[in-house]
Amino acid sequence: MKVKAAVFRETHQALSIEDVELAEPGPEEVLVKTVACGVCHSDLHALHGGILAPRPTILGHEPAGIVLAVGGQVRNVGPGDHVIACTSLFCGACAQCVQGRPHLCADRGASRRGADDAPRISRAGETIHQFADLGAFAEAMLLHHRAVVKIDKDIPLDRAALVGCAVMTGVGAALNTAQVVPGSSVVVFGAGGVGISVIQGARIAGARQIIAVDLLDEKLASARKFGATDVINAAAGDTVKTIRKMTGGGADYAFEAVGVSKLLEQAFYCLAPRGTAVLVGAIPHGEVVTLNAAHFFLEKRVMGCMMGSNRFTIDAPRYLEFYRQGRLDLDAMVTRHQPLERIDEAFRAMTAGEVTRTVLTFD
């Protein structure tokens, strides 16, 4: 099957719109027509070399679509089903999977084709890789069946797509990773798509105070609409000092949702005793974070967060039910729609802070 895709060939260069060939689905694979795909900062990090990815590769990892065909061993979805996909592939058999932590699967390679198998995607004999095992900036995707979950057909696919990454990560960071408790105080550094999702997760969890921190007043105003009770423009002064004053001695939870090491340090220092800082953003590979060890005697802690500690097949329907109930606002998160050919404009708007989420749509 020949489809159009945005191919990443060189760092810091525009993606190349190319025709690529998708193989027939293998026994455990699913062919999905891409209807919508959110544009995430992780795609841009990969384009700039901050996340290591083989090349050439098709970026994009926040899609929703319609199943076109399935392999003979696939039972969870069938042709015509509406699905969302997530990068949290899992084998189902390793120690992490059987203990209920599929997002930390030790053998996600089991869901890929073998070295001796024909590639899923190619162009004139050249193997084209799939970023995050998805490669969703394309008119169709060939995926392992454990990468997709069936959703109800009445949910708009451009909204549902966000659940695959931004919402899964941000809401999950609050509900699953940190397990925010009712009545607590929360700080979120960064009011982009993931940060807004953390804010919504904290609101759903019943946080008493939710402070959004960003450099753009427009994004801070948006954060209030999604549940932030207070906002801080980080350019205005000493952010840590301001947070400690606003919270009466420090926050119970602080989330770094940008991917900047200095912000993780600020998240740690703004905590109250026994507070928890959570790294949600993708800090570039190799960067070092420096913390004053004396603060650990106050029983503060720092946690990593992998995709919101998700159990994708359970959490995706759960979060979409929050959407149905009006508790999770996906509609307002979709700021713009763009065709695949406008992917570079989507990256520009994201970098400029003009959007919460741009969603690519496919005819």
Task: Locate the predicted segments by residue.
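C-terminal hydrophobic helical "lid"/dimerization subdomain
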Residues: M1, G249, E265-Y269, P273, ...
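Cysteine-cluster motifs in flexible loop/terminal segments that predominantly coordinate metals
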Residues: T87-R146
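Short Gly/Pro-enriched turn/cap motifs at secondary-structure boundaries
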Residues: E21-L22, P54-G60, G78, I128-D133, ...
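Mid-domain Rossmann-like dinucleotide-binding core that forms the NAD(H)/NADP(H) cofactor-binding site
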Residues: E139, R146-V148, D152-G237, K241-T242
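Residues located in well-ordered beta-strands
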Residues: K4-A6, D19-E21, K33, A64-I66, ...
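Glycine-rich beta-strand-centered segment in the early N-terminal region that forms part
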Residues: A23-C37, L47-V98, H103, D152-D154
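Glycine-rich cofactor phosphate-binding loops and adjacent beta1-alpha1 units
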Residues: A178-P182, V194, A205, L215-D217, ...
